[in-house]
Design a protein with these regions (language model features):
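Short alpha-helical scaffold segments that flank and stabilize functional sites
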Residues: 20, 33, 60-63
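A compositional/structural signature for long, glycine/proline-rich flexible linkers
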Residues: 45-470
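Bacterial signal peptide processing site
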Residues: 35-37
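N-terminal secretory signal peptides
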Residues: 1-30
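Ser/Thr/Pro/Gly-rich low-complexity linker/stalk segments immediately outside membranes or between
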Residues: 39-41
Length: 470
């Protein structure tokens, strides 16, 4: 089972585009080439596509990587059309990096080919954030009903919210009281998130999870079983490792098979025509030798690990990307985000600026929000620290994030300062204002902004600097 965390094998890649590389397959596809300056402001350019079979295979790998990874993840994600709920994360977890301590996940892999599925989100108390994210088979986020905007149409504006999730080509009638969520692929990943507020809140959130309803349309509101939630399960990074172990013939055979059930988007027609020249088609088989496929796969993998995303933004040292979640024909970005961790949110739902730092003995840092300049969000925000391997920072105070659970206290001038350091700062720092980091070595901070407001998305609000005091 996989959640939208970076798998352990990718733990050095701390943010979208953070360990970025060259152009590789992007140029061969005629996509925007990447700048190489530190500020990433270089103008983009295009390069004619290569007709070499190895280059085509490399580009096909970048194109198809999210599809294959999604399919392998689906196989490890439990029975189709049933919820599986995540265990509450703990600081001792070492299988998953960059743990999210703010929400619990509920996932279901939907097979929409036989008929539509119905999802009902129960009444949840005002102020508790939730998000139901629907990804197509290519890892694009297509729908995102949430507590901040349930996105209902021709249906009651009050909970419970009932959604009819339909596959491509469905032409039935939407029952009264339901909002249709049309998906472009028969395979759909439903990834739900519900805010939880520490250990004492876990049982309450579990109760909410078990009130989520999911069932085929044919048995909805009938005597049929409503597809109750599955057992709690732990996360795993196995799918990425499994795809990483595939050779060229295996990968491209899998890609062709999955495309037969989940065709590419109509905007991908030029890429698909090019791939067809070496037999990579929906339901097809590659027509070039295995050594060419293996060489192309190796080049494609190298392209992903060397890709520099020109759309990544730097703001006072923080790195983030406002172009993720839905990718259009930006195949390198789509593949890179999938490699970092499937399930990236649309920016309107969440933005995760990340910054790296280096502690040396008694190093002290701080993050200061100016008066009335706390992160502008429609839900909530948190700041979490990670060690050099992207695990939570072990500390005797068991403080791993700030901003969400304990209210922050402004100083006399209205500013709010977070002390970022290993040593306990003492009584002069209010409760909730200390974020422990490692005593020495590399560390990173992630600022999670849930339902960011327009001022975040248009750049009018900036993340404050991480200042080193000693």
């Amino acid at each position: 089972m996989s959640y939208p965390f970076a798998p352990r094998s990718r733990r050095r890649m701390l943010a979208l585009g953070a360990r970025t590389l060259g152009v590789g397959a992007a140029a061969a596809l005629g996509l925007a080439a990447c700048g190489t300056s530190d500020n990433r402001s270089d103008a983009t350019e295009t390069t004619p596509a290569s007709n070499d079979a190895k280059d085509i295979a490399a580009d096909a790998y970048v194109f198809g990587y999210p599809l294959v990874l999604m399919d392998v993840t689906r196989e490890t994600g439990g029975p189709a059309n049933q919820f599986v709920h995540q265990n509450p994360p703990t600081p001792e977890v070492r299988q998953v990096v960059r743990l999210n301590l703010d929400t619990l996940y509920s996932q279901a892999w939907l097979d929409l080919r036989p008929e539509p599925m119905v999802l009902q989100v129960p009444a949840i108390e005002t102020g508790r954030y939730w998000l139901m994210q629907f990804l197509d088979a290519w890892s694009n986020t297509v729908h995102d009903p949430a507590s901040t905007n349930p996105r209902v149409k021709n249906a009651p504006q009050q909970p419970p919210y009932t959604y009819l999730v339909t596959g491509p080509g469905w032409k039935g009638t939407v029952p009264e009281g339901m909002t249709q969520l049309a998906m472009p692929t028969g395979t759909t990943w439903l990834l739900g998130r519900i805010e939880y507020q520490g250990e004492a809140d876990i049982e309450h959130v579990r109760a909410i999870q078990h009130r989520l309803k999911l069932a085929p349309l044919s048995v909805w509101n009938s005597d049929g079983v409503q597809g109750g939630p599955g057992a709690l399960a732990a996360s795993s990074s196995a799918p990425a490792q499994m795809v990483g172990a595939m050779d060229g013939p295996t990968f491209f055979a899998r890609m062709c098979a999955v495309m037969a059930a989940n065709p590419a988007h109509e905007d991908d027609v030029d890429a698909m025509k090019r791939f067809a020249t070496i037999g990579i088609t929906p339901g097809g088989a590659a027509t070039v030798p295995a050594d060419v496929l293996n060489a192309g796969l190796a080049d494609g993998r190298r392209a992903l690990t060397e890709y520099r995303d020109p759309k990544s933004q730097y703001q006072n040292g923080w790195l983030f990307n406002l172009e993720v979640g839905a990718y259009g024909t930006d195949y390198p970005l789509r593949a890179q985000v999938a490699a970092l961790g499937l399930g990236a949110n649309l920016p309107r739902d969440a933005v995760y600026p990340t910054i790296d730092g280096n502690a040396d003995g008694d190093s002290r840092f701080r993050v200061t929000f100016a008066q009335d300049q706390l992160p502008p969000v429609g839900a909530f925000w948190s700041l979490t620290a990670y060690d050099s391997e992207s695990y939570l920072v072990q500390n005797s105070a068991r403080i791993y994030s700030v901003g969400h659970l304990v209210p922050l206290s402004p100083a006399e001038d209205g500013t709010i300062t977070i002390a970022v350091q290993n040593a306990e700062p003492g009584p002069e720092v209010p409760a909730g204002h200390w974020l422990p980091i490692p005593e020495s070595g590399r560390f990173s901070l992630t600022l999670r902004l849930y339902a960011p407001k327009d001022s975040v998305l248009n750049g009018k609000w900036e993340v404050p600097k991480l200042e080193k005091l000693s």
